[in-house]
Amino acid sequence: MRKIGYYEYNPVIYPRKLCVAIGMNQDDANNCFKGRNGERLIVDFRDSDALTFDSVIQKKDGKYTVFVNFANKSVMTMGICSHEASHICDAIEEDIGMKHGGEPSAYLIGWISSCINKARLGIGDFVEIKDRGK
């Protein structure tokens, strides 16, 4: 049976974690994360292969994070992953007041892309959702 959860990555120099899930449903996403104003996350893959939530808080520790959820592993193509990495980069830069462009942005996008690929390969700190539906 497949474990349900997400991979968590810490960029160290930026005050935002990156959480990457593959196929997480709406209930599980809302058990782990909430919007910064307490709103529920809407997970709907009918028109999307992936969803990036840029203004969320992890419920386990109250820390701000960027959360990306891919519908399944097969949609994690270079194009889709790059597209989501761009959104994630924009979100982190906006949060910390960093101007987009140049080497700092290129390195950040590279780190994000690497994290997404690691999640696709099953590498990283996996946070398993336990006690589902209780």
Predicted regions and their residues:
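Non-catalytic terminal regions of proteins
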Residues: 1-49
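Ordered hydrophobic segments in well-structured contexts
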Residues: 6, 17-23, 54-58, 63-71, ...
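Active-site scaffold of zinc-dependent metalloenzymes
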Residues: 34-75, 88
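Long, compositionally biased intrinsically disordered regions
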Residues: 66, 133-134
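A cross-kingdom feature marking charged/low-complexity
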Residues: 76-77, 129
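Active-site recognition of the HExxH zinc-binding catalytic motif
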Residues: 79-91
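Post-HExxH zinc-binding segment in Zn-dependent metallohydrolases
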Residues: 99-132
